Amino acid sequence: MTSEAAPASTAVTYKRVMLKISGEALMGDQGYGLHPPTVQRIAREVQAVHRLGVEICMVIGGGNIFRGLQGSAQGMERTTADYMGMLATVMNALAMQAALESLGIFTRVISAIPMDQVCEPYIRRRAVRHLEKKRVCIFAAGTGNPYFTTDTAATLRANEMACQAIFKGTKVDGVYDKDPRKFADAKRYETVSYDECLQKHLGVMDASAIALARDNDLPIIVFSLDEPGGFCGILRGEGTYTRVQG
């Protein structure tokens, strides 16, 4: 396996980033599960950024397989439902690892819940070393605790890994004052503050994740994962997105 990176002279906005995507992003047009061509397409987007020399962390949700809140709403104990959701994120992480490694990118799946035969346990210093060696680190199983979302896990790991920004890949090209898929007059923000996101319930991330980013001055870049080259373009200073900051 080879792992190509761009020359050090390549101009990029950030040197180490966290990419957060939902589990639903992996299911394509299906209503459930994994759509291998979609997983491969996202992996190629990550590959393009990796070639710039950027160190990449990832967190992937599990909603395409199981969502803890939905299980809880249907009568399942919340803690059990959340653990099931965490296991779903491990499945998605392994699928993404396979896709990235098929493109020649060394990748490590790092789980907050130990499962040594499947992936590595989370050890912060080891994970940092993987990044320094230009390996993609996919953090799975959330924080390892129920009642915390993968958005919060992504923000926590981004801070622990000293990422310079969180990139939140979504279905739309930024943060809007209302759903642009339903309202033609929806306005996209170029920048928006953490507090405004919380006060107006703009749906960027859950409140705990936004507060954790705010308290550590960690910007959140919201962009469309469906836009070819969008992730790479933003790191080159191009593209359409919303920046959430103080």
Curated annotation (Swiss-Prot):
The keyword Ribonucleoprotein is assigned to this record: no
Residues annotated as binding UMP: 62, 82, 143-150
Description of activity control: Allosterically activated by GTP. Inhibited by UTP.
Subcellular locations according to the entry: Cytoplasm
Protein residues bound to ATP: 20-23, 63, 67, 170, 176, 179
Record family assignment: Belongs to the UMP kinase family.
Subunit description: Homohexamer.
Name of the protein in its database record: Uridylate kinase
